[in-house]
């Protein structure tokens, strides 16, 4: 009997389906116990009695199936500016400036300060915004670079404003013969008038080529043997042509009448450079002197500028007529005022960084205080200057002699003509001075460049006795229509003002 009881106990212990007395309750047991609810404790009863007076937030027993999401737009209860879009230094300057008394400044000084701010900061400080009503960073000005590039890269450029590479023909549009053109680096032998007439000096003669009709006319020929034409320059209106000669003369010709109006003699050596400023004609000589001629009066010689020790081969008046830039064989670049100061005719700036003769001199059409210069074989550099501060904004090694520089207002670019070894024309993007394109075709060094009145075509005269026309700045149809509309609106306003 005892053996049977032992076997029965052992069998019951070995059964796996029997309930375990000390095991935790199963899930269904816990759910059933929670549904039945525990006995109310004194603390819970007190809590229920305290909250019984509140109005229920929603219908009892109704579960909310709507999931609360973050609103897509801010509530708009307050404005918190983004620090990345706030120019804190400019804001501090503008706020502190309000408490300072205004100093009486001349218009010239104010304009100089505005030009400095534009070149150093990329924007005018007086027109800067302290805080912006948007968290997106503002677009940088075209071509402007600074160390905080990340602020400008956060905003994607709109598709409509993205620039695509334009097509630049690698071959000239037309090639003209230029026999007996003088292979002299220091002369300026071509110029394009506002009437679309190209003047070319070939040894002792001056020829006129009409780009509209294709007609060619010989304007003049030197009478004495051994004499030659050393420079030509059109007046802004395009009806008079100034001619410099190897015999130290400056002649003034009426192109319509094909008649010489006057012969001005004041230099002691050949006149290799000419530049107009309204009725003032400036001429640079091999002696290193620059003469101002008032073509309206009999006593034409009104001023002499002495700032070079060797030949003046580059001479350009600024578009606004306030400054005259001169480059010489003494490696100097001088910037002269339009009127003498207290000390007489003294250069405002003198740049000495070039290591070779400076013939290429060109003013920026849209920034009157920016000047581009290029050096000869010993220098081979293109430099951009701020003539107000005297700072060199940029310098690029062109790897060859720089013979001429022109600005393109359509595309904010420069084009330069070069000598040995490739004799090419190079287009540069301003102000980064990145190389855009190279135009090759000349077999000898480029001597001079000039631009058509519409700014689309560049003519290059070279020592290979050819004159090549490059349509490298032609506007696309959309931009051409915009410019035509703007010019038409401007002319209509002028007519209304005249009435």
UniProtKB/Swiss-Prot annotation:
Entry's localization field: Cytoplasm, Cytoskeleton, Microtubule organizing center, Centrosome; Chromosome, Centromere, Kinetochore; Cytoplasm, Cytoskeleton, Spindle pole
Composition skew (Polar residues), residue ranges: 61-72
Impact noted for substituting residue 296 to Q: In OZEMA14; uncertain significance; decreased function in metaphase/anaphase transition of meiosis I; does not fully rescue metaphase I arrest in CDC20-knocked down mouse oocytes; decreased function in positive regulation of anaphase-promoting complex-dependent catabolic process; shows normal kinetochore localization
Phosphoserine: residues bearing it: 41, 72, 92, 153, 161
Effect of mutating residue 322 to Q: In OZEMA14; severely decreased function in metaphase/anaphase transition of meiosis I; does not fully rescue metaphase I arrest in CDC20-knocked down mouse oocytes; decreased function in positive regulation of anaphase-promoting complex-dependent catabolic process; shows normal kinetochore localization
SUPFAM superfamilies tied to this protein: WD40 repeat-like
Consequence recorded when altering residue 286 to S: Found in a patient with mosaic variagated aneuploidy syndrome 1; uncertain significance; decreased interaction with BUB1B during the formation of the mitotic checkpoint complex; shows normal kinetochore localization
InterPro entries attached to this UniProt entry: Cdc20/Fizzy (IPR033010), WD40/YVTN_repeat-like_dom_sf (IPR015943), WD40_CDC20-Fz (IPR056150), WD40_repeat_dom_sf (IPR036322), WD40_rpt (IPR001680)
Sites of N6-acetyllysine modification: 66
Outcome of mutating residue 92 to A: Loss of BUB1-mediated phosphorylation and inhibition and partially defective spindle-assembly checkpoint
PROSITE patterns: WD_REPEATS_1, WD_REPEATS_2, WD_REPEATS_REGION
Pathway this chain belongs to: Protein modification; protein ubiquitination
Family: Belongs to the WD repeat CDC20/Fizzy family.
Disease: Oocyte/zygote/embryo maturation arrest 14: An autosomal recessive female infertility disorder characterized by oocyte maturation arrest, fertilization failure, and/or early embryonic arrest.
Quaternary assembly: Component of a complex with CDC20, CDC27, SPATC1 and TUBG1. Interacts with NEUROD2. Interacts with dimeric MAD2L1 in its closed conformation form. Interacts with BUB1B. The phosphorylated form interacts with APC/C. Interacts with NINL. May interact with MAD2L2. Interacts with CDK5RAP2. Interacts with SIRT2. Interacts with isoform 1 of NEK2. Interacts with HSF1 (via phosphorylated form); this interaction occurs in mitosis in a MAD2L1-dependent manner and prevents PLK1-stimulated degradation of HSF1 by blocking the recruitment of the SCF(BTRC) ubiquitin ligase complex.
Listed name of the protein: Cell division cycle protein 20 homolog
Organism this protein belongs to: Homo sapiens (Human)
Primary gene name: CDC20
């Amino acid at each position: 009997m005892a053996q049977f009881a032992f076997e029965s106990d052992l069998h019951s212990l070995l059964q796996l389906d029997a309930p375990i007395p000390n095991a935790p309750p199963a899930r269904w047991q816990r759910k059933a116990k929670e549904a039945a609810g525990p006995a109310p404790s004194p603390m819970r009863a007190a809590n229920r009695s305290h909250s019984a007076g509140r109005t229920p937030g929603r219908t009892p027993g109704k579960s909310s199936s709507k999931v609360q999401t973050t609103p897509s737009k801010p509530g708009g209860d307050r404005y918190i500016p983004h620090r990345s879009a706030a120019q804190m230094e400019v804001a501090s300057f503008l706020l502190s400036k309000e408490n300072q008394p205004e100093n009486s400044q001349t218009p010239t000084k104010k304009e100089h300060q505005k030009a400095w701010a534009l070149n150093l900061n990329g924007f005018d400080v007086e027109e800067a915004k302290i805080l912006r009503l948007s968290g997106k960073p503002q677009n940088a000005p075209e071509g402007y670079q600074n160390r905080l590039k990340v602020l400008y890269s956060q905003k994607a450029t709109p598709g409509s404003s993205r620039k695509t590479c334009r097509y630049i023909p690698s071959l000239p549009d037309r090639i003209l013969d230029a026999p007996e053109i003088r292979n002299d680096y220091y002369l300026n032998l071509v110029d394009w008038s506002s009437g679309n007439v190209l003047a070319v000096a070939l040894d002792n003669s001056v020829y006129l080529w009409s780009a509209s009709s294709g007609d060619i006319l010989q304007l003049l020929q030197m009478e004495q043997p051994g004499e030659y034409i050393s420079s030509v320059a059109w007046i802004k209106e395009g009806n008079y042509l100034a001619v410099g000669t190897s015999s130290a003369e400056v002649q003034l010709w009426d192109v319509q009448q094909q008649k010489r109006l006057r012969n001005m003699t004041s230099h002691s050596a050949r006149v290799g450079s000419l530049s107009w400023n309204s009725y003032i004609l400036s001429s640079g000589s091999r002696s290193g002197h620059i003469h101002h001629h008032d073509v309206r009066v009999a006593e034409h010689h009104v001023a002499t500028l002495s700032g070079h020790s060797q030949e003046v081969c580059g001479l350009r008046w600024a578009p606004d007529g306030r400054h005259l830039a001169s480059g010489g064989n003494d490696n100097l670049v001088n910037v002269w005022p339009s009127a003498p100061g207290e000390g007489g005719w003294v250069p405002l700036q003198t740049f000495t960084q070039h290591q070779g003769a400076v013939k290429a001199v060109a003013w920026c059409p849209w920034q009157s205080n920016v000047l581009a210069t290029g050096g000869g074989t010993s220098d081979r550099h293109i430099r951009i200057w701020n003539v107000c501060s005297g700072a060199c904004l940029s310098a690029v090694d062109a790897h060859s002699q720089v013979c001429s520089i022109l600005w393109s207002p359509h595309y904010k670019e420069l084009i330069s003509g070069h000598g040995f070894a490739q004799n090419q024309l190079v287009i540069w993007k301003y102000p980064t001075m990145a190389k855009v394109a190279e135009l090759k075709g000349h077999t000898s060094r480029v001597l001079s460049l000039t631009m058509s009145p519409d700014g689309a075509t560049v003519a290059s005269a070279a020592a290979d006795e050819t004159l090549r026309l490059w349509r490298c700045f032609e506007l696309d149809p959309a931009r051409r229509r915009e410019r035509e509309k703007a010019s038409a609106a401007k002319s209509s306003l002028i007519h209304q003002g005249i009435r």
